[in-house]
Structure formats: structure tokens, C-alpha cells
Amino acid sequence: MYLVLLIAVILFIIVILMIFLISGLFYPEQEPALPISPPKKKCKTDTDCKDKGHHCVGGICTNMSCLDAIKYDIKDIKLDPNIRSCNYTPKFYKFSNTTADLQSPFGKTRIDDAELYDPHSGEDFCQRLCLDRKDCIGWEFDQYYAKTTGECYFYIDPHPALKSKNDAVLAIARKVS
């Protein structure tokens, strides 16, 4: 009697082991669960991002470079390869010593809007005028003689191509609130 019970238990264990063996052959091992990444902090302006070096880009706080942020904000933008850096400002990505090539599609959307004379600060004035226009994605200040004497140009093409030049400053509007 005990022998029959022992054989039954051994057969039961063998059947269970066979089930595990067969299921292991036919059902490949699942990938381990990915580690849960911390949620990205949502933002509307740079002041919402408390971490050092973080800026609000596309509604999330990130430490991506200014040029990468532009490419993220404005899809299909074509930047001149000579442009290697830019700066974040509260409403614009600002380049030093750059302008649009007048022959590019971006340059063809250049609108001559205002000629400035002292005592206005040219760049600040151009920036305010661009922010007042609904279609303005960028502005340029061509300086004449004094720091504040020059001309404002505005751009409305959504995919600008930037070209280097020594006597102008171009800024592209950021997509922040």
C-alpha cells in the first residue's frame, strides 16, 4: 500500500516537472520589467524648473542644450552648421552674431518693421515688437552706428534656416507660456 502511494507521489512530481519543462520550452522567458523612470516635471516657464541648469522645453523641465531645445521646439528647423551655440532667454532662443540668409526660405519671410534711433535699446525694442505680433517666430536687429541705432526685422516662416553674419542678432521665439 505504501509502495503504491510512493509511486503515485513520484509520478505526480514527474508530471508537474514535465509541465514546467514543456511550458518553459514553448513560452520564452519574458523581458524583465523596465525600471520605472521618475515622472518628468511639467512646466510652463523656466521658473517652474528648480533644478540647476534646467529649462522648460516642450512643457517639461530638461537640461538639454539650447540648440537641441530649438530642434525639439521647432520641428524640421534647419540650422546653419556654423552655429554651435545659443542662449535661453525667457521668451526667445538668442544667438550671437547670426542672421538669416536672404536667399533662404526663412530670409524671404523677413519683414522690415521698424527703424530705431536712440534712446531705445534696439534688441529689447525688437523683442517687444515681435512678442506683440502673433505670426512672429523670430526677430533680428541690424545695428547701424550706435548700439541702439538700427533696424528691426521679423520672421514668420516656421522653419528658419540661419546663416552666420557679424553685425546682427537673431532670436527665435520659444514655445513657453
Curated annotation (Swiss-Prot):
Residues 1-7 are intravirion. It is a single-pass membrane protein. GO terms for cellular component: host cell plasma membrane; membrane; virion membrane. It is found in: Virion membrane; Host cell membrane. The keyword Transmembrane applies. Belongs to the asfivirus envelope protein p22 family. This is Putative membrane protein 165. It comes from African swine fever virus (isolate Pig/Kenya/KEN-50/1950) (ASFV).
